[in-house]
Design a protein with these regions (language model features):
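Alpha-helical transmembrane segments in inner-membrane proteins
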Residues: 1-329
Length: 329
């Protein structure tokens, strides 16, 4: 199958950007390091203190930024494909808010138990998506109705989350408040279980379903004529996208706008929707890693939650996108 040079170059540039910013993030911080020291630490040849800084403190954060960004980018690409709407994303429709509601319930009931938090995030995201799906169902799914109902459910969940925080202990409320902003601070290898493996499984599932997604983009009638079970395929894709969002939320809190922005930027860079999930994964990973680097370095020695940076940049992009859509109409 012929692939355009622009598509290949854009994917290679995104991958190179991830590598460059990842390496810079490993070097930067309160203890500046050289590239040679990074390589030695990764190979186990560096002094113990440098190895500790690189492999236990900085490397998990960099890798999780890449993985979470990829998960959000793929999730956003799936939602925009299913909705056939540039505003179709899990954060706009409230699915990451539902996952965050699950996290809050788990934190209030079980404390910071990682498995309970991951499972509760999954449950919250999936239950929210099913409620939105059922309320929007009228002999099929209409995109506009689905998005409007999702926005309404999101508003209700925000109120519920505020009430939960008021009922929680002071320590839990402070921890949840930082997490609610979306933060990669303090991520270690131990805290990646079980959410990180789940993201990898769901990314694999998304890759296996990409053919169905492309056929659905041709229209329900065409997809059905080609042997695709339309509603079943749409539900499977939505569950994969919601699971990716929920697992990312369990790791770092509800990080907004990556899922919305990454697919748009990926399509503009390559000029095509082919390899859409791959492009969106690379773009989401690059955006979140760059945002986290800014969050760490802009106000040193203080660190911002990465969600503050993504909301600031994503809000500007959303305004531009809405203006462009209104001009088209």
């Amino acid at each position: 199958m012929f692939l355009s040079r622009r598509l290949i170059v854009s994917c290679l540039l995104l991958a190179a950007g991830c590598f460059a910013i990842g390496l810079w993030s490993l070097q930067s911080g309160a203890v500046p390091l050289e590239t040679g020291q990074i390589i030695a630490a990764l190979l186990g040849d560096a002094p113990r203190n440098i190895t500790l800084v690189v492999t236990e403190w900085r490397l998990p954060r960099v890798l999780m930024a890449l993985l979470i960004g990829a998960a959000l980018g793929v999730s956003g690409a799936i939602f925009q494909s299913l909705m056939r709407n540039p505003l179709g994303s899990p954060d706009v429709m409230g699915f990451n808010t539902g996952a965050w509601s699950g996290v809050l319930v788990a934190m209030v009931l079980f404390g910071q138990h990682l498995t309970a938090i991951a499972l509760a995030a999954m449950a919250g995201g999936i239950v929210t998506s099913l409620i939105v799906w059922l309320l929007a169902w009228r002999y099929g799914i209409e995109t506009f109705r689905l998005i409007i109902i999702g926005i309404g459910i999101r508003a209700m969940l925000v109120a519920f989350n505020t009430w939960l925080l008021l009922q929680a202990s002071l320590e839990t409320a402070l921890t949840a408040g930082l997490w609610n902003a979306g933060s990669l601070n303090g991520l270690t290898w131990a805290k990646t279980w079980p959410s990180a493996p789940l993201i990898i499984v769901m990314l694999t599932g998304a890759a296996l379903l990409v053919r169905r997604m492309r056929l659905l983009e041709m229209g329900d009638d065409s997809a059905c004529a080609l042997g695709v079970s339309v509603e079943r395929s749409r539900l499977m894709l939505m569950l994969v996208a919601v699971s990716l969002t929920a697992a990312a939320t369990a790791l770092a809190g509800p990080i907004s706008f990556i899922a919305l922005v990454a697919p748009h930027i990926a399509r503009r860079l390559s000029g095509t929707a082919r390899w859409g999930l791959t492009q969106s994964a690379l773009c989401g990973a690059l955006l979140l890693l760059a945002a986290d680097a800014c969050a760490q370095q802009l106000f040193m020695p203080y660190q911002l939650p990465v969600g503050v940076v993504t909301v600031s940049l994503g809000g500007i992009y959303l305004i531009v996108l809405l203006i462009q859509e209104s001009r088209k109409k």
